[in-house]
Amino acid sequence: MPKKFYVSWDNLQREARRLARRQLPVSQWKGIIAVSRGGLVPAALMARELGIRNVETLCISSYDHNNQRDLVVVKAATTAGDGEGWLVVDDLVDTGGTAKAIRDLYPKAKFITIFAKPMGEPLVDDFEVAIPQDTWIEQPWDMALEFAHPICDEE
């Protein structure tokens, strides 16, 4: 079983704010392209911190159950052209498969992620947190807080 790295809402917001600060000045951006689905929350945080209201989505999907799959663009950010002046935001770059497809679609965009693993790191222009390749990231939107029974209840 791979190692796990748990991300809280507080940590995600803090890391997003640090990453956003490096994207100034805002005047260089026409808008944000949020990579669905993992990049939707980080893109919302970036849009808020940078005061950007023009947010497009890029929806990339894959098929074939749980196996490594071919990428299919379900919806492109059509107003972004070749990406010049656009900030592409995703939560994570892992092996680089999705990142390569994004680079092909928007070669002139600046591509940023909150988290980066070594195999994907060369494909992004900026990221905030380096994560080992063999580590699974548990994002806050994939987790739920639950009641923890007191230890004395185990007796």
Swiss-Prot record:
Enzyme type, top EC level: transferase
The EC number(s) this enzyme carries: 2.4.2.-, 2.4.2.22
Alphabetical list of CDD domains matching this protein: PRTases_typeI (cd06223)
Pfam families per the UniProt record, alphabetical: Pribosyltran
Cofactor(s) of this protein: Mg(2+)
The protein's name: Xanthine-guanine phosphoribosyltransferase
Family: Belongs to the purine/pyrimidine phosphoribosyltransferase family. XGPT subfamily.
Gene source species: Aeromonas salmonicida (strain A449)
Binding site for guanine: D94, I137
